[in-house]
Amino acid sequence: MRVEAKYSKEPYNEAVKKNSSSIKLLEYNGNNVPKDMNTFYDLYWNDKGFYARFLSFHNGQIKFCPKETEILENGKTFKLWAISEVCEIFISHAELEFYREFEFAPDGRFLDIAIENRVGERKTDFNWVSNLEYKSKIYDEHWEGFVFIPWTAFGGKAPNLGDIWHGNFYRILTRDEKELYLAWNPVYKINFHQPQYFGEILFV
């Protein structure tokens, strides 16, 4: 699968939103989801970095971090995926075995991780810092997130027009105390760390 990340000097203005082409997530196995679980991502980029906007629909059931959960000095919330609903972005700008994982919660918490994932072994660097910026807002029927990730998180160099990176886009949510897993490109089992299923991100 392929998605276009569109060049925009002002990626969050209303004109850009109207002209965006959204990614829609499915169940991790490729099945469709109910309307109140719909999740959409819009992707943009410019000379400063990579931008994402996502809409996550809900039916009033949103899993939040316990209030006492610590936010670390670098701004991260450790093991965010296990204690909160999250939208996730996995991106590889080089070899598929090396990628970045970004997690975003409805309450504005985040987690960024550098990963080396070779056959039979996965190394995870929780101390890595991407210097991302994130804000979120919760509405009656959906919550919305805005993300900026500078190019320094991907080696420091912006892509050229026509370049192709690889990645996948996910959401973990809870309904009636059951965890559900959504993906843009299906991964066929409950394990998002399968770079062989990353789709193409084309910079246009």
Across the structure, where does each feature detected by a protein language model lie?
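Structural preference for beta-rich elements and adjacent junctions enriched in aromatics
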Residues: 1-204
